[in-house]
């Protein structure tokens, strides 16, 4: 079962710090014409292991989501695909592809900003971590800087619609 994690003030502040970094990466992605999603992977000492943003359009690669790119980079950096000691911060609830990669990497903790009512597969549309197909019990914190994460995405999509 996906495990909810309780927060103390210090933990909350640390999570906000890293989510702000993910938001900054998402902003750069949005300015480049990508859906503004950013991801940061940190170790237990608070060191950035990997970070990325969406690059589907730039790379013409449907798998170039922020989470997948960050997981790939972290695995290469550590020379190990087991990421159980790491935390992934991402601005938007992961899709099914990204959730699968998160589960397969045995990630220690997932922290995301805002639910995705269209394709979120942590809890919103589907709960992949709790499905019988999941062989890893994922710890999850959601709603960190939810409002700025939601507003960033909404503003980007409103701008895109006006440009059409």
Describe every region a protein language model picked out.
Residues 58-68:
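A short, polar/charged loop-to-alpha-helix boundary motif
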């Amino acid at each position: 079962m996906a495990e909810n994690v309780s927060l103390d003030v210090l933990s909350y502040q640390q999570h906000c710090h890293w989510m702000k970094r993910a938001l900054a990466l998402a902003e750069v992605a949005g300015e480049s014409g990508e859906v503004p999603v950013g991801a940061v992977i940190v170790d237990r000492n608070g060191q950035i292991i990997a970070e990325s943003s969406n690059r589907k359009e730039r790379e013409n690669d449907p798998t170039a989501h922020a989470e997948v790119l960050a997981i790939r980079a972290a695995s290469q950096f550590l020379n190990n695909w087991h990421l159980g000691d790491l935390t992934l911060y991402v601005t938007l609830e992961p899709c099914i592809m990204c959730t699968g990669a998160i589960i397969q990497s045995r990630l220690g903790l997932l922290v995301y900003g805002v639910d995705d009512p269209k394709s979120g597969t942590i809890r919103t549309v589907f709960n992949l971590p709790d499905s019988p197909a999941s062989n890893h019990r994922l710890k999850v914190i959601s709603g960190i800087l939810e409002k700025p994460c939601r507003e960033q995405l909404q503003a980007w999509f409103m701008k895109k619609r006006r440009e059409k």
